[in-house]
């Protein structure tokens, strides 16, 4: 749904003292996000920006994205939007808003069909290297990026809590109890390798082709990372596992290029990566069973089969 024109006009008015001459331009994303609505704008000098408008209920998503952009701005070699201005519009049509710099490029997802296998594999390897670079920002505890959010002191406590929440939801959405028990045992059996995580880092939590930018034409190289509203402090291999699950859907053979590009080292790290991928697949299965998009039964069956095979 597009941003209400009256709301958009009011938000632009609030930003104009900081960004003189700001107006809507013709740029628009190929696909809108599930939470925030994105609008292209320019200032009086023609400099391009992106305005993201969030529902009032998503204030934490806004604050998380602002903080994550600032943290990522300290990491060399990664192009990400920088926050320019943000705030909250109260009243009957309350929204949050974030004005950020605009990056060049298009979504990898928009070019995927045009890329040959060799280029796709090379890009996947680069994605692994870039994600490793993002993980240079370290935190203190596992959980919410914002200081007032829920956090846990150890990797194992974080994973154990997540496993409990996900398996309970799995049962509520019709998942077989025998498979839920297998998943719990699988995670418990890998407690030692999970606990070996050296510490939490900044995790994107959606480092996939819809949030990674490449040039619109020519050689596909990673030129931008966007959509940081889900960022958190977590095990870096949890972040990589989510990306690997996504790569597996498109080109299963490229999962090796991804993990090699990232630099997964030794059997312990590979096992830890497997645990996190199982949990991500379980979370996705739960969401599909609850939301029921087109073809949901087939998707649920495929994910149940994957979970059974991996545990």
Spans of features found by a protein language model:
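Charged catalytic carboxylate motif
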Residues: 7, 64, 126, 130, ...
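Short strand-connecting beta-turns/loops that link adjacent beta-strands
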Residues: 43-46, 91-92, 217-219, 278-281
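Short beta-strand segments
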Residues: 52-54, 84-85, 146, 202-205, ...
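Helix-rich C-terminal or lid/interface subdomains of diverse kinases
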Residues: 30, 59, 125, 161-165, ...
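Active-site acidic catalytic loop and adjacent metal/ATP-binding pocket
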Residues: 37-42, 83, 185-238
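An alpha-helical support segment within catalytic cores of ATP-dependent transferases
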Residues: 4-23, 88-92, 98, 104, ...
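ATP-binding pocket architecture of kinase catalytic cores
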Residues: 25-154
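Short secondary-structure junctions
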Residues: 15-24, 76-79, 266
């Amino acid at each position: 749904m597009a941003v209400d024109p009256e709301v958009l006009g009011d938000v632009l008015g609030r930003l104009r003292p900081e960004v003189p001459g700001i107006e809507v331009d013709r740029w628009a994303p190929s696909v809108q996000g599930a939470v925030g609505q994105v609008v292209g704008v320019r200032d009086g000098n023609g400099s391009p920006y992106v305005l993201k408008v969030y529902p009032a209920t998503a204030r934490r998503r806004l604050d998380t994205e602002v903080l994550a952009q600032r943290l990522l701005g300290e990491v060399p070699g990664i192009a990400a939007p920088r926050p320019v201005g943000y705030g909250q519009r109260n009243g009957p049509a309350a929204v949050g808003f974030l004005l950020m710099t605009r990056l060049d490029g298009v979504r990898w997802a928009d070019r995927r069909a045009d890329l040959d296998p060799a280029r796709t594999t090379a890009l996947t390897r680069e994605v692994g290297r870039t994600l490793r670079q993002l993980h240079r920002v370290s935190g203190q505890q596992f959980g919410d990026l914002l200081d007032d959010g829920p956090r846990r002191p150890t990797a194992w406590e974080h994973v154990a809590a997540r496993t409990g929440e996900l398996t309970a939801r799995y049962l509520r959405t019709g998942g077989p109890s025998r498979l839920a028990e297998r998943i719990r045992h699988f995670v418990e059996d890998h407690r030692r390798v999970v606990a070996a995580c050296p510490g939490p880092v900044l995790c994107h939590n959606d480092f996939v082709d819809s949030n990674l930018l490449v040039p619109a034409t020519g050689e596909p190289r990673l030129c931008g990372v966007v959509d940081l509203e889900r960022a958190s402090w977590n095990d870096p291999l949890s972040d990589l596992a989510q990306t690997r699950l996504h790569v597996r859907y498109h080109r299963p053979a490229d999962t090796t290029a991804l993990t090699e590009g990232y630099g997964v080292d030794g059997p312990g790290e590979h096992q830890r990566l497997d645990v996190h991928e199982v949990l991500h697949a379980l979370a996705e299965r739960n969401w599909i069973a609850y939301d029921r998009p087109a073809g949901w039964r087939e998707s649920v069956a495929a994910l149940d089969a994957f979970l059974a095979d991996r545990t």
